[in-house]
Amino acid sequence: VLVLAKICVRYQYLLPVNVKFIFQPAEENGQGTQIMLDAGVMENPHVDQFLMFHYVNDAPMGMELHRGASTAAIGSVQIEIKGKAAHWSSSERGIDSIYAAAKIIEAAHELNQTYQSKWPFIVGIGMIQGGKAKNVVAEDTVLQGTLRSCDLKDYQNLRELFLKKISEIETETNTVIQVEIDEEPIPPIINDDSMVDLGLKVGDEIWGEDSRLVTQLYLSGDSAAYYFRYAKGLFLVFTAEKKG
């Protein structure tokens, strides 16, 4: 992208439009896009069309793009479980927060197996921290994870089902559970149809058969999806597999 920016600057007198390059900060925590939008990145000059580039090295040389959604809606999951500490020699006096955590993890796996959808989705717990000593019933346990879906309706359905199951586990285990699952997730990136058509045309001219319109959806996501609310956009993936 830096090379492309250099070329555009060098030959800007040949370009019939203004070209603005955006290098996004804070990508991993999902905050970068809003920072840029608040700073007026889509104005001065006003942005009418938006291209987003991504590079991967696990597919043959070429270009891939989707029609419609190309990434997933992504929400964070934070679960705090409060039990009651007790020595394991008198465990009946305690309330085991790790046991409740285990049931929540099992519920997430069950939801992944039983929820029916034509779109990819996942409910995943990636972090667990609980207990203070090996001989003490764990009073506090914290779970962190992610909820991802390529369909916003599925996202909301999965969120409600998971919250309902966690509430049942709270009653069953006599714990107190606080749950935060983003009600408004980072949205999926939705490619503009006219931009897809243009991308395919240019891709055919440059890449030929190595320009691919793909249908497989991935559960990756990016807060750059918010840019697509301000201008017609296209998310392009350039592939450059290194063989050997």
Feature-to-residue mapping (PLM):
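Metal-dependent amide/peptide-bond hydrolase catalytic core
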Residues: 99-244
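Histidine/acidic-residue-rich, glycine-tolerant segments that coordinate divalent metal ions
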Residues: 2-4, 8-127, 131-138, 222-224
